[in-house]
Amino acid sequence: MIQMQTELQVADNSGAKRVECIKVLGGSHRRYASVGDVIKVTVKEAAPRGKAKKGSVYNAVVVRTAKGVRRKDGSKVRFDDNAAVLLNNNGQPIGTRIFGPVTRELRTEKFMKIVSLAPEVL
């Protein structure tokens, strides 16, 4: 469950290390985002020679949450951290690698690239 001012780890090699959610996209008063939702983030910490610079604003898709995702069979998938993947204006990932597992809920037409780059899909 991600809301405004939540800090997330970045699960790609775009150069950003840590980002902060500044808006949950999709609806005028939407409060929370979960896995697969797109949020607006600002970069709080970045690698020296990465594509993403500190202070820049991007769209990102949430790939892991500590709150977890409930499946239709009653099981729940939780993670140790909250993580996101930065997106460009076309909705494609900025990085060329994804670190850590992602959930099967990302397997939609928009985010198949992220699922194919991920080392593990839960």
UniProtKB/Swiss-Prot annotation:
GO terms for biological process: translation. The keyword RNA-binding applies. One of its GO terms (molecular function) is large ribosomal subunit rRNA binding. Signal peptide: none annotated. InterPro entries: Ribosomal_uL14, Ribosomal_uL14_bac-type, Ribosomal_uL14_CS, Ribosomal_uL14_sf. SMART domains: Ribosomal_L14 (SM01374). Pfam families: Ribosomal_L14. CDD domains: Ribosomal_uL14. Disulfide bonds: none annotated. Keywords: Ribonucleoprotein, Ribosomal protein, RNA-binding, rRNA-binding. Transmembrane segments: none annotated. Belongs to the universal ribosomal protein uL14 family. HAMAP family: Ribosomal_uL14. Part of the 50S ribosomal subunit. Forms a cluster with proteins L3 and L19. In the 70S ribosome, L14 and L19 interact and together make contacts with the 16S rRNA in bridges B5 and B8. NCBIfam families: rplN_bact (TIGR01067). This is Large ribosomal subunit protein uL14. It comes from Francisella philomiragia subsp. philomiragia (strain ATCC 25017 / CCUG 19701 / FSC 153 / O#319-036).
